[in-house]
Design a protein with these regions (language model features):
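Helix-breaking motifs and short loop linkers at transmembrane-helix boundaries and internal kinks
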Residues: 49, 81, 102-108, 246, ...
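C-terminal membrane-cytosol helix-exit motif in multi-pass small-molecule transporters
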Residues: 179-199
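C-terminal transmembrane helical hairpin of 12-TM major facilitator-type secondary transporters
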Residues: 280-324
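Intracellular juxtamembrane helix-capping segments at the cytosolic ends
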Residues: 123-135, 319-332
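Conserved MFS/SLC helix-loop-helix module at the cytosolic interface between two early adjacent transmembrane helices
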Residues: 68-106
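Cytoplasmic helix-loop-helix junction between adjacent transmembrane helices
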Residues: 112-150
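Paired small-residue
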Residues: 92-99, 107-116, 304-312
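Helix-to-loop junctions at the C-terminal end of transmembrane segments
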Residues: 70-81, 266-278
Length: 336
């Protein structure tokens, strides 16, 4: 990613908060397009006359875009200014969702989802760095949590609304709405996010070298295992809740909102814990998450326990993020 940014002491707390809100708006849009697709699988499957597992390729394509995009953009954009990069990333995201909305075939939709996923990791990485630099020492994890709060709020408001919109007006309308959010984010970043002063240039080799550091690798491993478990549950959550727990399909927007509330709670809690004791806090959260993921297999067979379990999955999964992001920034050094 681009060079480190110094703090901006001339900005008022209100200006800083407004900039972080603009960054969170992008996280909101990303959260909607990432998670709403899982609630729209049946509609997508019906539209193209395919099975739900086949429709699941639109989720896999997005995930592949995330995996491919993060390292490639790290190398290609190492000398870019952060505000410029953030706008370009959201431009790609917007384009991917607009193409998805008008996709005439499954293949086009899969390609569009791949494109929309490419900016995902880089956006959150750069946005977190900008937010942390604006917040200053002692408040960095909470600033990161505020950016990521957009992702959590998406699951409370955006995903249920997108699911409802997709059911009422077709899944295409949900992706088009996300495209509008992406375009609004580009404008918001241009207007309220400060252009950092030029600092020390970080070369791509230094950024890639950070991946070889044991602490960085350990942090990435914790994230891979934790989020892998979370998404293993969430990817087919509609099938689990409807066919296993016995919840009526019409209640899915409300169920997804419960998951989103868990993410909001976890995001706030995770930021507070990370600022107090980063490593011990992450260990505690990861341990609790492991237990909850294991118990969900049993909880999923009853409507009440399935919903409670989903809330806790969202809480613990989201609580990991601020601490992991802050830890990566701490140990990556110049490679951040």
């Amino acid at each position: 990613m681009p060079q480190p940014v110094a703090e901006h002491p001339g900005f008022s707390p209100a200006r800083v908060q407004l900039a972080i809100l603009a960054l969170a708006l992008g996280g909101f849009g990303i959260g909607v397009t990432e998670f709403a697709a899982m609630g729209l699988l049946r509609s997508i499957a019906d539209s193209f006359d395919i099975s739900e597992p086949q429709a699941g390729t639109v989720i896999s394509a997005y995930a592949l875009g995330v995996v491919v995009g993060a390292p490639l953009l790290t190398v290609w954009t190492s000398r870019w200014r952060r505000r410029t990069l953030l706008m370009v990333l959201m431009g790609l995201f917007t384009a991917g969702n607009v193409v998805a909305a008008f996709a005439p075939t499954l293949e086009t939709l899969v390609a569009a989802r791949f494109l929309a996923g490419i900016p995902h990791g880089a956006y959150f990485g750069v946005a977190s760095l900008v937010a942390a630099s604006l917040a200053g020492a002692g408040k960095q994890a909470r600033a990161v949590a505020q950016v990521l709060l957009g992702l959590s709020v998406a699951n409370v408001i955006g995903v249920p609304m997108a699911t409802w919109l997709g059911e009422a007006a077709g899944w295409q309308s949900a992706f088009l709405a996300v495209g509008v959010i992406g375009a609004a984010t580009v404008i918001a970043i241009l207007v309220v996010v400060p252009e950092p002063t030029v600092g020390v240039v970080v070369r791509a080799r230094e950024e890639l070298a950070a991946l070889a550091r044991p602490q960085v690798l350990a942090t990435l491993a914790v994230g891979a295992v934790g989020f892998g478990g979370m998404f293993a549950i969430y990817t087919y959550i509609q099938w689990t809740m409807v066919d296993v727990a016995g919840i009526d399909r019409s209640w899915m927007p409300a169920v997804l909102a419960v998951y989103g509330l868990g993410m909001v709670a976890g995001n706030i809690l995770g930021g507070i814990i990370a600022d107090r004791d980063l490593d011990r806090g992450l260990l505690l959260i990861a341990t609790v998450m492991t237990v909850i993921l294991a118990l969900f297999a049993v909880a999923a067979h009853h409507p009440a326990t399935a919903v409670i379990g989903l809330f806790l999955v969202g809480t613990t999964g989201s609580a990991l993020v601020p601490g992991l992001q802050t830890r990566l920034m701490r140990y990556a050094g110049r490679g951040q």
